[in-house]
């Protein structure tokens, strides 16, 4: 009788790279980084398509006769906008004669504002003020601030009021022989000579708790008054000083100007200038007292429900060639904590006309069609990687990547994976210790193809018991890592959240500190990923060793009395009793056996966070169960000895 020895061979060459892990090591033909660096896309996007709203003008107005050529957004995004050609939030607040008056209102956790150009130097609105840019800046800033704290907002275009009987609505030559809708100008008709100076005015207005279906917890009110250079300019008849003051229901002064206690400007001029301060007032009844002759009466407001903190994006709104713009929107957003500003890099060049349908702006706003994982001043990201090459400028919200160098990201094995020998006392021993970990004294198991034929055998753990790391223990390990990481980061997250509210007060110092914190977080995350990588490698290695044990057990079971196991992975067969077809059945599974499969290794890691926290992440979680790695066996190397 001729007896031969058939073994699973140990083979590996210099093309393999070694990967060390907790509980076991691997050789692999390939390797890949756990994550690739992502690059943010410039422009605006949103975290959730169902929770955002926009306010715009003709560039987002679907009813415009030139739509879609006039639009800077897609038709899908235009449906989200509350827009009317020629409109702006400030025009609706003040209501200059002859201008579009649109009822802006809507609800959303994330609010995008792309409007403002229709009140700019080009429109040349006067009404006792040649340059409205400062008022526009304060108005837009107040809108952004309150919008970031509210779910819903609405223009209130008719406040309840009580006006003195002797006062009637007045007009002004420098306001198209009309006047603003808000504030309204009321004047006294003075007849008796002894009353030539007139009487003081007392009026009342009420800020509602609700306007239509919109709840109002806070109102933005324009407190407007005149500024005179001197008392003589105000009243050449020698009457008293000018004043216009707003009081709340308790008699406290909340706005206005009183030249009885405040000096005049002292400049030379004979025409007053109207000033409007932006007040944030609670619902209630307010009184307005003014010096004789006339009264500026608040008749509109913007109301906010103040129900939740949200996101605000402001888009630069400028004219194209030949028209003068201001940059109040830009300045207002930059001076409002948490406001993200979208700015053009080139002049506005329209498609429909010089001022509508700019290609660069369309690209910057194209992200509004999608959901992003992170939005920031640097742009938006929808990839899952936790790392980016450059630091993302705040404000930023969502699951934002941290800055890292590519070479610092850990690598994991890929391709053909071979477990090494080693000892891990935490691993449950298989029932039969064929290819047990402690038995793998030298070399690596590598099953190579000797002769073509079979479809292959996919190795991996197909049992919930036996050797190797169990699914339950692996999941518990990853859960513990996630909890530890959250504890590690919690104090940092709280600190950064507080810094977000202070960013505008000491901007550079805060930004520098924030950058240091984010760098530390990036280094910590890289270290955490290194631990996870080592656990993955060990988990895969142990699982593959168990799979080899399963393969050896399968061979022994198939052989029965025809083959005698003489050492781990080696059998003696009588060639005269078990011919080639017999050996093929034992070792090649007769070339017809179905190929068992298991899920491939999934190393996807997801960084979870509060979607409106402007830092990065609050914790780390494995999004899907970790499967043991798969090793494809194309055949069995046969080492014959007589």
From Swiss-Prot:
Residues 28-138 are annotated as: Esterase domain-1. It is an enzyme of class 3 (hydrolase). Residues 2-27 are annotated as: Fusion domain-1. Its EC number is 3.1.1.53. GO terms for molecular function: host cell surface receptor binding; sialate 4-O-acetylesterase activity; sialate 9-O-acetylesterase activity. The keyword Cell division does not apply. The active site is at 58 (nucleophile), 353 (charge relay system), 356 (charge relay system). Residues 2-617 are extracellular. InterPro entries: Capsid_hemagglutn, Hemagglutn-estrase_core, Hemagglutn-estrase_hemagglutn, Hemagglutn_stalk_influenz-C. In natural infection, inactive HEF is matured into HEF1 and HEF2 outside the cell by one or more trypsin-like, arginine-specific endoprotease. It is found in: Virion membrane; Host cell membrane. It catalyses: N-acetyl-9-O-acetylneuraminate + H2O = N-acetylneuraminate + acetate + H(+); N-acetyl-4-O-acetylneuraminate + H2O = N-acetylneuraminate + acetate + H(+). Keywords: Disulfide bond, Fusion of virus membrane with host endosomal membrane, Fusion of virus membrane with host membrane, Glycoprotein, Hemagglutinin, Host cell membrane, Host membrane, Host-virus interaction, Hydrolase, Membrane, Signal, Transmembrane, Transmembrane helix, Viral attachment to host cell, Viral envelope protein, Viral penetration into host cytoplasm, Virion, Virus entry into host cell. GO terms for cellular component: host cell plasma membrane; membrane; viral envelope; virion membrane. The chain crosses the membrane at residues 618-638. Residues 138-297 are annotated as: N-acetyl-9-O-acetylneuraminic acid binding. It is a single-pass type I membrane protein. Residues 353-638 are annotated as: Fusion domain-2. Residues 639-642 are cytoplasmic. Belongs to the influenza type C/coronaviruses hemagglutinin-esterase family. Binds to the N-acetyl-9-O-acetylneuraminic acid residues on the cell surface, bringing about the attachment of the virus particle to the cell. Plays a major role in the determination of host range restriction and virulence. Class I viral fusion protein. Responsible for penetration of the virus into the cell cytoplasm by mediating the fusion of the membrane of the endocytosed virus particle with the endosomal membrane. Low pH in endosomes induce an irreversible conformational change in HEF2, releasing the fusion hydrophobic peptide. Several trimers are required to form a competent fusion pore. Homotrimer of disulfide-linked HEF1-HEF2. This is Hemagglutinin-esterase-fusion glycoprotein. It comes from Influenza C virus (strain C/Pig/Beijing/439/1982).
